[in-house]
Amino acid sequence: MNIVLKLSSNACQQLSEKYKSYEQTSKNPYIRFFAKVGKTSISVYTSGKVVFQGSDAEKIASEFGHVAQVVPKKQTNLIGTDEVGNGSYFGGLMVTASFVSDNHLKFLKEMGVADSKKLTDEKICQIAPKLIEEIPHVALVVEPEKYNEVIASGYNAVSIKVALHNQAIYLLEKQLGSQPESIVIDAFTTEANYKKYVSAEKNHPLTNITLLTKAEDQFLAVAVSSIISRYKFLENLKKLSKESGFTLPSGAGNLSDKVAAQIIKSKGIDALNHLAKLHFANTQKAMKIAQL
């Protein structure tokens, strides 16, 4: 387990004194105190960031203000969220929040719902429309042009996702007209980061939120959101490919660089604003290939 806290100078000093007998040397110049307590390491950085890593990370971190997350025990009466497109240069960013009740369990089992990464695109395109029809959800689709505008306004790759997850949950709660027992987000950042960014947002859900790694493997609501988001992303990529006249690949690899370079040569650099996430490194690589 890996837990990150931001502590004051006094708290860092107290921690260092408490675990001084466990202190070891660190080669990292930015670590001012390093200790190994059993199978758990404690790294205190000059910035005040403290990283607890190992089997007792949660226990030790709780001594300095960390509050352990309560993992929901039920699959139902729960909202789950997931996003797709954040790792792809071409195409937009899709975030979906879905609500699963007891009445949906049989249907979801029949559909063979699982994390979208474990399903073929063909399978996703088969079952996603049925999920969209049956499962209460809110899907937010941010086209590349809007994405670039939001990033230019001061958001970053993490804060834009926080804003979208937060808004999708808020809108779904309003749609349901009642609070779910739990909300689970497939973790894409630390809890501290999420809280920092979400505090700047206007609307906030009423139910407590839990961020979990690989939540799509644990909760059907997250898996449903994963599938719907992937479907929306594939549809968006298909639409943009048709509009541009180029087959736009998913992902952010060499093929994306080459296709982007072809678009630049054919339509000019400005054409990418409608098709791709410009802050990705692919933009500079494509410009180099296109010899701009």
UniProtKB/Swiss-Prot annotation:
Pfam families in the cross-refs: DUF3378, RNase_HII
Free-text comment on the cofactor: Manganese or magnesium. Binds 1 divalent metal ion per monomer in the absence of substrate. May bind a second metal ion after substrate binding.
Biological process annotations from GO: DNA replication, removal of RNA primer; mismatch repair
Location of the protein in the cell: Cytoplasm
GO molecular function term, any single one: magnesium ion binding
E.C. numbers: 3.1.26.4
CDD domains: RNase_HII_bacteria_HIII_like, RNAse_HIII_N
One GO CC term on file: cytoplasm
InterPro entries xref list: RNase_HII/HIII (IPR001352), RNase_HII/HIII_dom (IPR024567), RNase_HIII (IPR004641), RNase_HIII_N (IPR024568), RNaseH-like_sf (IPR012337), RNaseH_sf (IPR036397), TBP_dom_sf (IPR012295)
Entries under SUPFAM superfamilies matching the protein: Ribonuclease H-like
Principal cellular location given in the protein's record: cytoplasm
Top-rank EC class of the record's enzyme: hydrolase
Co-factor requirement: Mn(2+); Mg(2+)
Known catalytic reactions: Endonucleolytic cleavage to 5'-phosphomonoester
Family affiliation: Belongs to the RNase HII family. RnhC subfamily.
Protein name stated in the entry: Ribonuclease HIII
Species annotation: Lactococcus lactis subsp. cremoris (strain MG1363)
Primary gene name: rnhC
